[in-house]
Amino acid sequence: MFTTKLTKRDYDAIVVGSGPNGLAAAITLQQQGLAVLLVEANSTIGGGLRTKELTLPGFKHDVCSAIHPMAVISPFFSKLPLEKFGLHYIYPPVAAAHPFDDGTAAVLTQSMEETAKLLAEDEAAYLQLMQPILKDWPLIADEVLSSLHFPEHPLAMARFGIKALSSSTSVAKRFRSPEAKALWAGMAAHAIQPLTKLTTAAIGLVLMTAAHLRGWPLPRGGSYKIAEALSTYFTSLGGKIETNYTVTSLEQLPSAHAVLLDVTPRQLLQIAGHRLSSFYTWQLKKYRYGMGVFKIDWALDAPIPFTASNCNLAGTVHIGNSLTEIITSEQQTWNGQHPEKPFVLLAQQSLFDNTRAPEGKHTAWAYCHVPNGSTKDMTTAIEQQVERFAPGFRERILAKHIMNTSQLESYNANLVGGDINGGAITLSQLFTRPALRWSPYRTSAKGIYICSASTPPGGGVHGMCGYNAAKRALKDIFNIHLKH
């Protein structure tokens, strides 16, 4: 299926980069009967969708993305027959748990009513926040996960937008209990910026919506299984994939009517800068990247011994204790500091997927936010946070593998300074990333498009950046109009 030397034939379209967005773009184009080539610099496809034995033999670790709530609610991915190509999701009983110092934990479950009820005094407030979004989601999903335009359902979109454009701290004021405030803060911190900033509520609301619609699943066998299913489906349609080929200039590529690049603005300038207008080049140079991450994978002798039993039912555990603690951690990181008690996002896939570790053994995956480009080792700080809520954790570590922001970027050039969202998701870069244009997917050069997480709707494994860019190219270049 994969080759290493580019052929000289012509193509209708070429996609550079085989992350989830590159794969989505390639599939969308190939579904229309075009001749499509997908080019990847590495020996394997997938971008952030890769699974490797990073620590010890038999221990499979997700190198980048691990838990996939956005994949299963993606309007594009959900239409693809990926199960036929080997993709099977596992749904932990609890989507996410949030432990506290007193030995208890708040939980996010697939049932909105159950989640609300467990929040006790904040039951009504939680339902008031989430019920309208879940009711409207079928109407607004495509709108939320695309570029800024006049919506087909303006009232439903307005109801969501008023909440989504808010700061996370303002949404937290809806709740009275420390537990509800903290659970919300953990969701909102996925925005990877201070919780006091406008728009930080958006990601938290979408992630909670995903939990109540489908759950927060993990692919059996590892995140690479998503890329494998997508690529196999693409080639089954007649698409061609070439690996081990790094593109540094458009001149390296065969001729094509359209080229879609699953890259950041920085790489776009390197590859196609000579074809871009001076104004568009100026816009791309102004594009801002967000905080980075420091990541650890562990091979464990036994499961993480969380004090709160609910954590043992969760695929994801948010470690940050309180709203105040998480606000402080994220603000310090934004200011260029390294928190003593960082907010930690942890996944424990092997509790639910026995293919991830040898019998009786386990894996865990975690990261914390750090200043962009930081090379500080946060291992001790992260492990202290886990140990805080799971005494005895460190005694169960058999081996570990760490990646700082520099190592993450070396592994995947789209992770600039360790930024896993493809750029800061600020008010000015939420819908207009990477530049303010009628279509953010078009560059200033005809036939050249950007389809990475640096375009709307941003980071996450959903493929919508690639799908939206491919729709734009189909309309512009091939006069093919896709409604949804």
Name what the model sees in each region.
Residues 101-198:
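Rossmann-like flavin
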Residues 207-248:
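Helical element adjacent to the flavin cofactor pocket in flavoenzyme catalytic cores
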Residues 243-357:
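Mid-domain catalytic core of redox enzymes
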Residues 451-474:
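A conserved FAD-binding loop/helix module that cradles the flavin
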